[in-house]
């Protein structure tokens, strides 16, 4: 039997990552695997170390939700706060609430831990507000906390919520994964919402000086969610602008929808300083997804006297977006396009993103071409760059190219592909394969995790399936990587400031946690003979390849990595094993690419962009932080819509039973991903009534005390829907049985 001294040692080592989730002493018992006879010693250890728990109540932070906060779904440890805990230090961040209603502030750097905010220190802030926080000390050596000094920027102006009436007062309740609050609401004449109906509301008064805020109903949305209401809920609460400013639309309206061609192969741009090369005779094609709307890139592989050249033509967005104009300001504020299953919120007005900038087939388009020669061994040489004019021969899809290439490989006649293009695709496949091998040789990480594709019909999700990943995808990926790298090397060699795409190596503590988890799953000693991080990660991926834990090792590996970002420093790209890398190939949908296009033109001698280079030199760091943040905002919005859409989809199949596999564990249960449709849901341990289960973080399992039934990653289960919450994008499953064979095998 373990005594108080044992438990004090255990708590010093293990309490920190668990503390936020422990809201009753019973939670501590489960997390630590405390036997009944050890509970007195464990409580004494808790008390001696200042871990206060109210055993009579559900927890000091409100009602128990049965699952852990979204930000704490199993992930690897974050880095230290870099001195941000010192008393008096002030930091800016975004206020959010955990699922238990506990306020925290998320700082701009994703590597820094969140700041805890007690309820009495919230001031007048609402969830999603950008706030200034001052660190303050607690008595008795307890961890410091944050006090909100002021609201820097309001996070929500409009929101989708449920209308209700209570005590004769009308209100709208807003709920998502980060917030849950209600505001009194006014209902304009002509609108008559029913209790429980979804409405779009606008906040007219924010809570200040003890006064409660107020809202007004703007639009009625019906009783049930659709893809439209989900998209509206996410974009409004996350400040994703759905409309362009009037100035941007007026500016876009003045741009001719077609490209006027001057005679001659090399003519200067109108009001420009660089010759534009006429490449319309070359067989450029675009290869994109079937539902793509904007075509940034076209590719062409030509052979001249036994020498091969790859040409990557990218939409010349900088020609159409004047520096400092309203389109430019709107695009910078957005930072990126946002893609949902059934719609896109573009960075540029549609007349540009889907019109004159998009490389549609059979029409003249202005581009920037990267021309890369290959030697006889198939190795790329020094690239050249030029403004260009192309006319795409065909708009191909990944499916088109995959079907054509696989039919040839299987000995059947190629599909309906023009001869010249078909032959070019076959040669492209060979060159892409060589590039892929070279990438592996230099130590780049390469692992595929299936992504879900949601099919929408009639405004509702009708199907969720794994998106295919074929050689046609890899072909374009390799060519874009090569073009981006060529631009980064060219600009760096000439000393021009621009935004690099930076991916730093994972922190050592993240690596240790990943290797510890991987070793448990694979029952294999940690790989210590390789000292560099990349080799260690690739060794673990290789050890798992082809086995039942391959997916889980890849998921853990992905979570151990740092987030990529933009910045003016040349810090390398860890995942690609490149010293210098940038984003150049998607200027229609990414503002950093537009920056790089402008700097490239300056490097090629276009004097119009010389002042812009000085701007990048002075403000590159600030721009990188802003654009990295907008990228994360877009990714969060896309994930939020996907989670809600999956919850809506699975709610229509409430009577069915599914095969799934455990993907991860928490102190409150475990997550299961369905084999059929890649929908993930949570199984609260409290829903298992056949035994008393104890959680062992060391062994990575939930284990039944009596029946010894074990739940651990990789275990196959039969489950059915217990609850689907579309507002929060949360799904709960109920276990109805086990399966012998591992799913996804």
Walk through the language-model features, giving the residues of each:
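Charge-lined substrate channels and their catalytic hotspots, especially those that engage the 3′ end
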Residues: 1-311, 318-363, 395, 400-405, ...
């Amino acid at each position: 039997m373990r005594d108080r001294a044992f438990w004090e040692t255990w708590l010093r080592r293990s309490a920190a990552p668990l503390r936020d989730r422990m809201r009753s002493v019973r939670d501590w018992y489960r997390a630590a695997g405390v036997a009944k006879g050890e509970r007195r010693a464990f409580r004494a250890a808790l008390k001696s170390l200042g871990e206060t728990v109210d055993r009579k109540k559900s927890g000091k932070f409100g009602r128990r939700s049965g699952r852990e906060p979204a930000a704490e779904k199993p992930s690897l440890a974050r880095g230290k706060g870099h001195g941000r805990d010192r008393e008096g230090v002030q930091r800016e961040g975004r206020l959010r609430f955990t699922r238990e209603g506990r306020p925290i502030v998320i700082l701009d750097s994703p590597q820094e831990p969140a700041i805890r905010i007690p309820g009495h220190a919230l001031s007048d802030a609402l969830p999603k507000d950008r706030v200034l926080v001052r660190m303050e000390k607690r008595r008795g050596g307890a961890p410091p906390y944050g006090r909100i000094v002021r609201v820097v920027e309001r996070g929500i102006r409009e929101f989708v919520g449920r209308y209700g009436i209570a005590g004769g007062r009308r209100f709208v309740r807003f709920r998502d994964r980060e917030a849950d609050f209600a505001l009194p609401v006014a209902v304009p004449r002509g609108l008559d919402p029913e209790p429980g109906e979804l409405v779009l509301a606008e906040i007219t008064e924010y809570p200040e000086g003890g006064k409660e805020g107020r809202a007004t109903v703007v639009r009625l949305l019906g009783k049930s969610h659709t893809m439209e209401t989900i998209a509206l809920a996410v974009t409004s609460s996350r400040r994703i602008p759905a409309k362009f400013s009037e100035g941007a639309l007026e500016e876009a309206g003045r741009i001719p929808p077609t490209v006027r061609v001057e005679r001659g192969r090399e003519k200067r741009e109108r009001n420009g300083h660089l010759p534009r090369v006429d490449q319309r005779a070359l067989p450029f094609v675009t290869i994109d997804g079937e539902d793509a709307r904007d075509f940034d890139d076209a590719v062409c592989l030509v052979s001249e006297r036994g020498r091969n050249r790859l040409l990557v033509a990218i939409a010349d967005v900088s020609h159409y977006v004047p520096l400092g104009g309203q389109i430019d300001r709107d695009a910078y504020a957005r930072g990126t396009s946002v893609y949902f299953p059934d719609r896109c919120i573009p960075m540029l007005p549609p007349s540009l993103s889907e019109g004159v900038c998009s490389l549609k087939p059979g029409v003249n388009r202005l581009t920037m071409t990267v021309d890369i020669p290959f030697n006889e061994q198939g190795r790329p040489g020094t690239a050249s760059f030029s403004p260009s004019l192309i006319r795409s021969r065909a708009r191909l899809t990944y499916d088109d190219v995959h079907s054509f290439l696989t039919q040839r490989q299987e000995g059947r006649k190629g599909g309906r592909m023009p001869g010249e293009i078909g032959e070019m695709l076959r040669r492209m496949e060979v060159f892409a394969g060589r590039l892929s091998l070279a990438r592996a040789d230099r130590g780049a990480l390469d692992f595929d995790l299936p992504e879900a594709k949601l099919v929408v019909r009639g405004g509702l999700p009708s199907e969720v399936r794994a998106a295919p990943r074929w050689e046609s995808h890899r072909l374009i990926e390799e060519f874009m990587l090569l073009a981006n790298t060529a631009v980064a090397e060219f600009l760096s060699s000439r000393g021009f400031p621009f935004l690099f795409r930076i991916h730093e190596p994972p922190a050592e503590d993240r690596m240790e946690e990943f290797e510890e988890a991987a070793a448990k799953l694979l029952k294999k000693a940690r790989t210590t003979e390789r000292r560099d991080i990349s080799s260690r990660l690739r060794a673990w991926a290789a050890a798992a390849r082809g086995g039942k834990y391959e997916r889980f090792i890849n998921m853990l590996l992905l979570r151990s990595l740092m987030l990529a970002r933009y910045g003016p420093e040349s810090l390398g790209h860890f995942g690609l094993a490149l010293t210098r890398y940038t984003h150049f190939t998607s200027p229609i949908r990414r503002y950093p690419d537009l920056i790089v296009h402008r700097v490239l033109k300056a490097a090629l001698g276009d004097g119009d962009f010389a002042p812009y280079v000085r701007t990048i030199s002075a403000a590159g760091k600030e721009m990188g932080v802003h654009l990295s943040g907008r990228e994360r905002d877009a990714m969060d919005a896309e994930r939020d819509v996907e989670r809600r859409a999956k919850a809506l989809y699975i709610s229509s199949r409430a009577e069915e039973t599914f095969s799934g596999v455990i993907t991860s564990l928490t102190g409150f249960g475990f997550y299961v991903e369905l084999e059929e449709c890649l929908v993930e849901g949570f199984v609260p341990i409290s829903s298992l009534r056949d035994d008393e289960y104890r959680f062992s973080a060391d062994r990575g399992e939930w284990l039944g005390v009596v029946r010894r039934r074990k739940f651990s990653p990789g275990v196959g289960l039969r489950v059915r829907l217990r609850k689907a919450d579309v507002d929060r994008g949360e799904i709960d499953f109920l276990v109805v049985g086990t399966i012998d064979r591992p799913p996804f095998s």
